[in-house]
């Protein structure tokens, strides 16, 4: 089987790392060999797989050793739950340098040192509020072929998902990158599944799975475990297995996204009654003022 390079993008705090690690833990049950490359400066892309606080990052270890050339693969690559290989690229100190540089350095080092040999999936976990050059690196350099956007029914998550789709479109024609689908991580906002489905349709993709909110996820996280490991027989574990099966069956089915404008996004929110038009806001304000008079 040829190597599948997938990436999970999403705005900070959306539950992207949790969703990706639970999905990958479920993929292992399908006898898939997996390498996770964390591309988020928080370096939390592997903690549930390694049961550790935060993995030492490639950038941190390279700084200690002198340069990345002074590192060995075993210095940066750790083996976690059911043999999943884990690497964190890391980022610079806040306010200094470009976090994307760590991503570029790490991927090149891993490829040159054979980390991609003998795996079925490489999964990049990428911060997606900013689709700056560095964080777009897995897309731009034609590494990640299938992008899964983790989002919710909240306006900023929808906005970020649309922005990420713009980033994918920019490189879709020059490389082979495609949008695999949206994963909605339930926030229990109004009309959430309908909104997520509507955005997926507008972006020319699918809502690949709607992950319901369940406190068992937090219980597992406190123990630095995936739900798959902590509560394998739970309904939530089944949700992640369904998501993993859908991702596994989605090979070659990605699309070139059709992002929408900010105005179109706001119109969509108004159609769903989530956002009020300026006329409605003005009318409400006038009604309030009239009531005071």
Swiss-Prot record:
ATP binds at residues 10-17. One of its GO terms (biological process) is nitrogen fixation. The keyword Oxidoreductase applies. It catalyses: N2 + 8 reduced [2Fe-2S]-[ferredoxin] + 16 ATP + 16 H2O = H2 + 8 oxidized [2Fe-2S]-[ferredoxin] + 2 NH4(+) + 16 ADP + 16 phosphate + 6 H(+). Gene3D superfamilies: P-loop containing nucleotide triphosphate hydrolases (3.40.50.300). The modification ADP-ribosylarginine is found at residue 101. Pfam families: Fer4_NifH. Its cofactor is [4Fe-4S] cluster. The reversible ADP-ribosylation of Arg-101 inactivates the nitrogenase reductase and regulates nitrogenase activity. One of its GO terms (molecular function) is metal ion binding. Its EC number is 1.18.6.1. Binds 1 [4Fe-4S] cluster per dimer. InterPro entries: NifH/chlL_CS, NifH/frxC, Nitrogenase_Fe_NifH, P-loop_NTPase. The keyword Glycosyltransferase does not apply. Belongs to the NifH/BchL/ChlL family. The key enzymatic reactions in nitrogen fixation are catalyzed by the nitrogenase complex, which has 2 components: the iron protein and the molybdenum-iron protein. Homodimer. This is Nitrogenase iron protein. It comes from Azospirillum brasilense.
């Amino acid at each position: 089987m040829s190597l599948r390079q997938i990436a999970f993008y999403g705005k900070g705090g959306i539950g992207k790392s949790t969703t990706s690690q639970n999905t990958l833990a479920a993929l292992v049950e399908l006898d898939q060999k997996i390498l996770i490359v964390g591309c988020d400066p928080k370096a939390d892309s592997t903690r549930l797989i390694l049961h550790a606080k935060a993995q030492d990052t490639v950038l941190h270890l390279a700084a200690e050793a002198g340069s990345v050339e002074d590192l060995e693969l075993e210095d940066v690559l750790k083996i976690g739950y059911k043999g999943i290989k884990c690497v964190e690229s890391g980022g610079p100190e806040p306010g200094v340098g470009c976090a994307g540089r760590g991503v570029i350095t790490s991927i090149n080092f891993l490829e040159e040192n054979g980390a991609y040999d003998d795996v079925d999936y490489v999964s990049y976990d990428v911060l997606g509020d900013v689709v700056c050059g560095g964080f777009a690196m897995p897309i731009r350099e034609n590494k990640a072929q299938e992008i899964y956007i983790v989002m919710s029914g909240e306006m900023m998550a929808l906005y970020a998902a649309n922005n990420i789709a713009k980033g994918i479109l920019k490189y879709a024609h020059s490389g082979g990158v495609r949008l695999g689908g949206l994963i909605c991580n339930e926030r229990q906002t109004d009309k959430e599944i309908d909104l997520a489905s509507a955005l997926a349709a507008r972006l020319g993709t699918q809502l690949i799975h709607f992950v319901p909110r369940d406190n068992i996820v937090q219980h597992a996280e406190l123990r630095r475990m995936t739900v798959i490991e902590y509560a394998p027989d739970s309904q939530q574990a089944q949700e992640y297995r369904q998501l993993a099966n859908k991702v596994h069956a989605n090979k070659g089915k990605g699309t070139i996204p059709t992002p929408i404008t900010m105005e179109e996004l706001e119109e969509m929110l108004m159609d769903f009654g989530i956002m009020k038009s300026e006329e409605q806001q003005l009318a409400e304000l006038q009604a309030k003022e009239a009531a005071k008079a």
